[in-house]
Each structure stands twice: as structure tokens, then as C-alpha cells.
Amino acid sequence: MTDEKFLDKKMDRREFLKKAGIGGAGLALGLSGASAFFANQDSSTKKALDGDEDISFYGKHQAGITTPMQKACYLVVLDLHTTDKKEVIQLFKDWTDYSSKLVEGELVKKDGSNALLPPTDTGETVGLNPYRLSLTFGISADFLKKLGLESKRPKLFRDLPPFPKEQLQDKYTGGDIVIQACADDEQVAFHAVRNLIRKGRNKITMKWSKSGFAAIGDRKETPRNLFGFKDGTANVTTEKEFDKVVWTDSKDWMKGGSYMALRLVQMHLETWDRTNLQEQENTFGRYKESGAPFGKKDEFDEVDLSKLPVDSHVRLAKEVDLPILRRSYSYSDGIDERTGQFDSGLIFIAYQKDPDRFVKIQTNLGAVDKMNEYITHIGSGLFACFAGVEKGGYLGQA
């Protein structure tokens, strides 16, 4: 997953532009107060489609949601260890300041002349451009509870119910804050999260994290998961669809935000690899090579449910008829010590204006989805991702 540009010793893009003279252009704590997908022109990212333009941290909505997918994702879930609202507001202000610089490829802070002090920025991206870095933040219902803000919890912000067949592990379940860092370079994404966490070390600890990757090619093809099937074909792709499916239109502090359903899905690759092609395709209800639904020729042809096995993944998901925006990444963490097999799977991320959309889909999949023979849901969380930040403002200020 190493980007060729990472090893390029030539002058970086930002330095070239400078030399050429071109130049680059309360937390609701006050709370009262994919093929076509990769071509969508989200307002915060429409200049980033060539892979070389920065993605602004500021805007009506947070970047990293409808933003065209990047090649790498570093996701971390954090536990909060303060009940002081003022401390959390300051943390979110600091994160806003850091994030606005990180997405532009700048140091989080320039250091003084005292070499006996640790550098403020860890420095592993010096000389690199931002590689379309986006940073997305969300909070859980437990976050509100810890700060005595349960009365500010939106009605839609309900806990995810138990689902059939899941085997959730405590270490991958729950948490108070999520940070999703995506970029076209793995080290850039990690650097961003590392420095954000470093800034808040006296208030937060890491609960769990995963480094993900996506085979997005030139962004014109839907990425494939580790089972070799295209993942995200049915995604919504237009601004009109985003308003209908992704962005909340509530009158509370979540207006303009989105709910992230997060699932850590372990994929049993060795079992899958021993399964014949016909059975694999029956599991999905799509042809493996083309991604077309059964009975059709093209990936994006309309699905005819009558042509799909009754327990196929696509049929069960389509029966609910509630679109969501999938933004998932594959992961591989070496070897599972218990089994000696690959510890690999999917960081399933779905955004929607109402979490009930995801709940209804997953409930329909839970008991009879043939996919359950090859996967196990081991982690879960639901996070409210704020609306975007205007310049001069800070995360969660609505």
C-alpha cells in the first residue's frame, strides 16, 4: 500500500508551487445554543479529484464523508477521561487548529530554537504533500453522558441494538470519540491521528484503532473487498442524494452532520478461499468479475430480486430499500494467534442521516445472510459526526 510518491526524492508539490510563484490558495457542549461515487463533486472536495489538490477542513459538512475515497484510512476510537466541558471545548479547538494545518501539509506548530525540547510535530510527513488528507470526527452517546449532556442527545441518536450472529469483543465496542483520517498515503493518515492524539493525551486514551486500505485505482472503479467482490456499488452519488440520505436536517446541533455506523468485521479468508466460484457468487448475488447482479450484464444495472438467492447478501440488503453511504476499508493485521490464519477483514463504515437505516438493513441481514458463514462482526459503534466547521469556529460549536 506504499504510494510511489512517498519514495520520491524530488521537490514536493508545495515547494514547487512556491518557487514557481503560483501559491496555494460550544462543541454542542453549549449544545443548547462506487464508481460514480468517486466522481461526485462534493463542495469541499471537487478540486481534489485529480489526487493532488488539498481537501479543506472547513465547510458546510465535514470532509471524509462524501469525499471521494482515498487509498488509506487510519481510524481510531478514543475514551474520554474528563468531565470538564471547558477542557473538552479547548481540546476541540486545538484539534480544529491542528486539522486545518494537517490537511494542507503544514506542521501542526513551528518550534522555537530550543533543541532540548521535543518537537511539537512528530515530523514523519516533512517533505510530503497532504495526499488528499481528510479528517472526520464523531462522538458517541457515552460522550454526552460523561459530560452530563444526556438531555442534548438527539432523538435519532439511539444505541445500536444487538444483531443476530455478532460476536462483539469489548475492546472493539463502544468508545467516546472517533477520528477517521483518510489519505492517499498511509503515513500521512497515521501522522495526522498521531499528532491529534498527542495533543489530547491528558484527556483521552486510545481504545482501538485499525489501519485500512482500498484498491481504488484511478477512482473510476468500485473498490473490491478481500473476498474479491466490488464493495459500494449501490452507493448514493449526487448532492441531491446526499441531502436525502446522508446529511441530517434536524433542528438540533446535529443539523448538517451525519451518523457513522462503525462495524469491525473479521473475514474468514481461508474458508472463503476453499469455496467454489458459484457458491461465492450465490453468497453475494452478483457476478464476481463484473459486479453485475444476477441476470444482468453491468455492475450498475438495476437489481431484479427474483433472480437472486433468497439468502444472498445483496437481496437481503435491497429488500429493505433504505440507501446508505458505505465508506469501508479492508484491513490486515498479520496472523490470528488463536487460529494461525489471517487476521483480516473490513472496517465497515456507513454514513446516514438516521441510524435506523443501518439498523433495519443489518437486522434483515443478521439471521439468514449467507455471508455470515464467512464473516464475524467483532466490533461496533455509533457516532454522531458534527456538521462542518466554518473558519474561525471549532468542532462541535453548533
Which residues are covered by each model-predicted region?
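N-terminal secretory signal peptides
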Residues: M1-E15
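Long, histidine/aromatic-enriched segments associated with O2/redox biology
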Residues: K18-A34, T45-A398
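Short hydrophobic alpha-helical membrane-entry/anchor segments
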Residues: A39-Q41
